[in-house]
């Protein structure tokens, strides 16, 4: 089922906080839709060592090997959870994006001059192409394992959501950075993460395409 069909059924027909796009954030001088998960360990570690700093963006890379292990374990968890709900992940790893947009992502950009973004319409995806977590998938999995009492919400954390499920949550609660009462520390991502499992659908939105690029 594509989003155009979802809008005409059930909850979505009366949705008043409609969000109909994803945002991919990347460095302007780099190719979009790239992933550390596509690289050999030594290549990924080299990149993380170069990006490591004390900002919310770079601090996660202070132990690059452990980060890579956690990332791959998280991607496997999301992939298996999505498949269990009927998803059809066609790639071994997802391209991560944000549902709607994120002021937090813009604010933590380590180099504003290199910051760029591409908006992808949700209408190109079906239910079997894309999964979601609240918030970032690594944080969601971490919360579900550690269950920190000040942050853990079992109905949201440790859950893999389909397109229709996440839109139902947005219809009920609004968008996290605008409408939710959250006590997440400022260094943790507050957005809804989207995991795109069909990379071929993104080719038309690469550099040189005028749609939604920033």
Short names for language-model regions:
Residues 1-14:
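N-terminal amphipathic/basic-hydrophobic helices that include classical n-h-c signal peptides
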Residues 7-10, 81, 101-106:
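Short alpha-helical segments and helix-capping/turn motifs at coil-helix boundaries
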Residues 16-21, 28-61, 91-93, 102-214:
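Conserved NAD+-utilizing ADP-ribose enzyme module
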Residues 57-95, 99:
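Short, intrinsically disordered low-complexity segments
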């Amino acid at each position: 089922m594509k989003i155009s069909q979802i809008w005409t059924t059930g909850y979505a027909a009366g949705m008043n906080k409609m969000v109909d796009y994803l945002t991919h954030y990347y460095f302007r001088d780099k190719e979009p839709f790239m992933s550390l998960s596509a690289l050999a360990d030594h290549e990924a570690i080299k990149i993380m060592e170069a990006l490591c700093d004390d900002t919310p963006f770079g601090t996660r890379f202070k132990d690059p090997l452990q980060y890579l292990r956690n990332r791959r374990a998280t991607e496997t968890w999301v992939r298996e959870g999505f498949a269990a709900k009927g998803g059809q992940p066609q790639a071994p790893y997802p391209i991560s994006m944000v549902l709607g947009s994120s002021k937090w992502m813009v604010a933590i950009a380590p180099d504003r001059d290199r910051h760029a973004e591409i908006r992808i319409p949700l209408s190109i995806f079906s239910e079997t192409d894309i999964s979601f977590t609240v918030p970032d998938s690594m944080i969601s999995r971490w919360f579900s394992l550690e269950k920190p009492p000040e942050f853990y919400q079992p109905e949201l954390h440790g859950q893999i959501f389909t397109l229709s499920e996440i839109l139902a949550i947005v219809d009920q609660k609004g968008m996290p950075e605008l409408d939710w009462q959250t006590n997440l520390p400022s260094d943790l991502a507050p957005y809804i993460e989207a995991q795109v499992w069909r990379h071929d659908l993104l080719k038309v939105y690469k550099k040189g395409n005028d749609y939604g690029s920033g």
